[in-house]
Amino acid sequence: THLTTLTEGATINPFDNKVVIIDEAHNFVSRIVNKLKSRKKTSLSVKLYEYLMDAIDCRVVFLTGTPMINYPNEIAYLMNLLRGPIERVLINTSSVISWDEGMMTSFFRTLKDIDTIEYDSIKRLIKLTRNPPYFETILNEKGERIAVKYNKDFPQESDILKWVDTWRSKFQEKVSGIELNPLEKLQKEDLECLPTKFEDFANLFLDGLNIKNALLFQRRIQGLVSYYKGADERLVAKEVNPDKRLVKVPMSTPQFLRYLEKRWKEIQMDSKKGRSKTELGEDFSSYRTITRLACNFALPPELDQKDISKEQLQEEDFQKQELDAFEEISKDPRKFLTLENLNNYSPKMLEILKNIKKEIGDGPYFNKQFIYSFFTTLEGAGLFGLVLETNGFQKYKLIKEQGIYIEDPSLKPGVPCYAVYSGENVDERDYLRQIFNNKYSSDFPTTLKQSIKEPNRLCIFIASKAGAEGINLVNVRNVHIMESQWNPAIVDQAIGRAIRICSHASLPLEQRTVDVKIYISVFSEEQQKSIDGPNIVPIRRNDTMLKRYDVEQPTDTFMTTDEYMYDLAYRKGRISKNISLLLKQSAIDCEIHRKLHSKEQPVIQCMRFDTTTKSEDLAFKPSYLLEEKDTLYLRNIIRKSRQLQKIRIKGLAMILDPVTNDIFDFVAFEDNQRLLKIGTKISPTEIHFLV
């Protein structure tokens, strides 16, 4: 493999002394967590993770707009990769006549690469961490550390255990009465910036859907994050009615009964596996797959497969196994997919169809529609293509003549077309995307381009999860998400296919809008209370749980699988947004971009340490286990009151503390009364500004 070549047969670390840049880093981290959860520790992503964590003098740069995809503790893996392992050496003593911590600290402060110094007087143990490579400590005249400075010529032994031997003899000379253990008896710890184990992360930082110990989280990630909002909002299409994204579609009676049959099978399977139904740290990619499909389309009994194995459930696109049923529907689609029949088998698809007909407008310039489904064929993207074809639309087709692609001349003029972005022919898929966008690359076949009679006829683009990744669409006016997902990142990625920088630049200003709809099947009021149906009582008992979305207070509700998935995504989304806010507030450039980000909601209040904090104080301790929780940390902060004055110097407004002569930024003070020190008044006519 390529990794074997890079590592020369696992004999070297390819990331030693390297700068590693990873785009879309959330995908990389998510794969690591998924593989570790499934105990696949030999997978490529896990091996890369281990090589990065073990690399010597490696710098990692991650580019991402998404802090987490599936699990809240993904952010811990991401931050740990950026920070690297916090190496700490544990130095036992073989002989102690006099344990003088002050004398030892005085010696250690002469070593320019020491970061933290800790002692265990009972075990006679010294614990030391070091600055990153090439960073040396700067001391003031009192011997206090006031800064660290990069110095490319500053040497450092890469092995922290061997490093002890570089100063051992000097220590014995300066500190009498203490004998250090030899190198072979020293120990090294690799500490984490944040806990990666889900239970540990949740216990330390999660409080329901909120974040606890936010200050602790922010202190430990200091210096790791940069945040810039990005392009001018005027370059991005605006989503209209974002508060009306969710479309709840009540089930029909036939669909409800079919749903109950399938749900009972799932409950029995879950009970055998002992599966939890509310754990945020669980993989839901194959959870309730049978009823997720039933929420889209309730197959009539004569077409439904009798049994679905456990192995099939582990395949996210297992619906391919139901191609026989799909082919049966294809033979006589009017039997199942007319408006009347859709009302029985899939009220949800009927609702999507109605909205498309309402929004698509009149030709020849149809409003472009993007339809996304997690599922590929039956009950998903492929089936909805048949729904369109049965109800006044036509499938866009390319044909080959003598090896050359052209538009199918048999297409009906003036009838809007759809295309499903699937299939193994990569070229054909990309041609369809370019025709939909009406924007062609330089290598697009000239013959095909000349054969296109109505450039805007292909106006409906359907894609599944597998197909939607990485594609860019242009001038989409409506996005239809066919089912709820188990995490909001999937929905955001799908919407991101249609709303991109300058994706609507060719439209008039008033048309640069996108309406997004997420459709979920729900129980009607009658079905919520019904006692008629197979196994309805045990199903209701099992599936009644706290509903948190779309309610003022969490309420026990009998929810469909669609609703449950949406509620799960809502919970994950709340946590993700809260973590994202902490990242933005902790960014090293937060103050620099404060004005640019001033319109964001919730408001970004840049993290800052208390004004009594001294330069030698630590932002965080090496081990998160020894950190003060926020309640104790805040209790120990010395609270001071100041009488401040607003002054103007050469027309510039500033804030002055007349007692200390500290000068603070006026704009920052207006922003939630934040005191951002920018200098010191040293005379009535002179100010020394911080550099």
Language model segments and positions:
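Helicase motor interdomain insertion/brace
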Residues: T1-N472, Q511-S530, I536-L632
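Conserved SF2 helicase motif VI
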Residues: N487-L509
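Short conserved active-site loop signatures built around small residues
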Residues: V479
